[in-house]
Amino acid sequence: MENKKKKAVVVFSGGQDSTTCLFWALKTFDEVATVTFDYGQRHAEEIECAKEIAEQLGVSFRVLDMTLLNQLTESALTREEIAVKDGENGELPSTFVPGRNQLFLSFAAVYAKQIGARHLVTGVCETDYSGYPDCRDVFIKSLNVTLNLAMDDQFVIHTPLMWLDKAETWKLADELGALDFVREKTLTCYHGIRGDGCGECPACMLRRRGLELYLAEKEGDRA
């Protein structure tokens, strides 16, 4: 495989998407490290979940302090007094944190350079997402160029989920032998509940719909 004997850094939150990407990276690269960001998210459970998953999968885990984001912007992901809701009339969801993926990938690249890794893996997706502008493919491609110019390096940002909807993301996890692991051990819920979550927030509903659709399609293929 082309990427074998290469080292990768996975931007890791312990959620469904980044955990699926971690399994993908473990199949794709020889050495994998994870980096998680503490940006003042409303449930610290996310960081603990990411740490536990990294330990179970035997990959290095590092937390970087990005709490300054909470000083610069207000979001439902960082402020408990802000309700979690989808965007309406073209507005962004209340969970959008401006600049988050740009900063996370930039700092991940600095860390990658330090440990000799040239591959960055992130779970952003433009197909079945909440409308975040920093999840778009055009942004990732632009940032990839910027990072290489800024650090005079040849980083490659991998986005295994970019063109997958949630059902297809579950399918990928299943193909990687990780469906049950992802379903039971990850944290997607905006209210900090692991596994199937609260079932009511936008993240849980998207995750559940995708899983139900994939399982129905899988059962149909068996019939």
UniProtKB/Swiss-Prot annotation:
Pfam families registered for this protein in UniProt = QueC (PF06508)
Give me the comment on cofactor binding.
Binds 1 zinc ion per subunit.
Q: What is its EC number?
A: 6.3.4.20
- Protein origin, superkingdom: Bacteria
Per the UniProt record, the source organism is: Halalkalibacterium halodurans (strain ATCC BAA-125 / DSM 18197 / FERM 7344 / JCM 9153 / C-125)
Family listed = Belongs to the QueC family.
Its gene name is queC
What InterPro entries does its record include? QueC (IPR018317), Rossmann-like_a/b/a_fold (IPR014729)
Which pathway?
Purine metabolism; 7-cyano-7-deazaguanine biosynthesis
Q: Which residues hold Zn(2+)?
A: 189, 198, 201, 204
According to its UniProt entry, the function of this protein is described as:
Catalyzes the ATP-dependent conversion of 7-carboxy-7-deazaguanine (CDG) to 7-cyano-7-deazaguanine (preQ(0)).
Q: Give any single GO term for biological process.
A: queuosine biosynthetic process
Q: Give the Gene Ontology MF terms in alphabetical order.
A: ATP binding; ligase activity, forming carbon-nitrogen bonds; zinc ion binding
Assembly, per entry: Homodimer.
User: What are the record keywords, sorted?
Assistant: ATP-binding, Ligase, Metal-binding, Nucleotide-binding, Queuosine biosynthesis, Zinc
Q: Does Transport show up as a keyword for this record? A: no
For the ligand (ATP), the binding residues are 12-22
What is the required cofactor set for this protein?
A: Zn(2+)
Q: Could you identify this protein by its name?
A: 7-cyano-7-deazaguanine synthase
As its record notes, the protein acts as a catalyst of: 7-carboxy-7-deazaguanine + NH4(+) + ATP = 7-cyano-7-deazaguanine + ADP + phosphate + H2O + H(+)
